[in-house]
Amino acid sequence: MQTVSASPPHHHHSASPVWEAHARAALAAQGSRAGGARQLVIAALAGQDCCASAQEIHARIAATGGTTGIASVYRTLDLLHGLSLITRIDTGDGVARFEPAHPDGAHHHHLVCDTCGSVEAFHDEALETAIHAVADHVDFRVDAHDIVLRGACRTCR
């Protein structure tokens, strides 16, 4: 029997202070000052475990009393993505979503409800094993992969 672990809907774990420190150090190492909007976006990303759109990150910043423009959020996301500090996730609805790229390579995949639009993270060790088995079979080196399963969540079924 296969074990799949998924976060309950709307339940997020923080990305960890390790990622936040790593992101700030990477910005400093390449000469970017980590002020204002960059600090706010990094803090918002560090407080999530699953992907969020620029608009959702902007709303999260505003909800915690931070003030920055949406254009600054987009610029910061572009910078962080260019430094491989965040992963861009395409869930198929035309909205780019972002999440921390953990320095240790830890990652998860996504379940997307086509009815309500909810996105839920899941991890399945058997799936990871199968991906690497296929790669070995066809003599291919996998550097990264994204799995997005689309369908209907428990609430919408």
Regions found by a protein language model. Give the residues of each.
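Non-DNA-binding regulatory cores of transcription-related proteins
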Residues: 82-157
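Pre-recognition alpha-helix immediately N-terminal to the DNA-recognition helix
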Residues: 39-44
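Short capping segments at the starts of secondary-structure elements
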Residues: 36, 47-53
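Basic amphipathic alpha-helical segments that dock to polyanions
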Residues: 73-83
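A short acidic, leucine-rich amphipathic alpha-helix
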Residues: 56-62, 73
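Short, leucine-enriched amphipathic alpha-helices that occur as contiguous helical runs
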Residues: 20, 37-38
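Short, Lys/Arg-enriched N-terminal segment that forms or immediately precedes the first helix
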Residues: 18-31
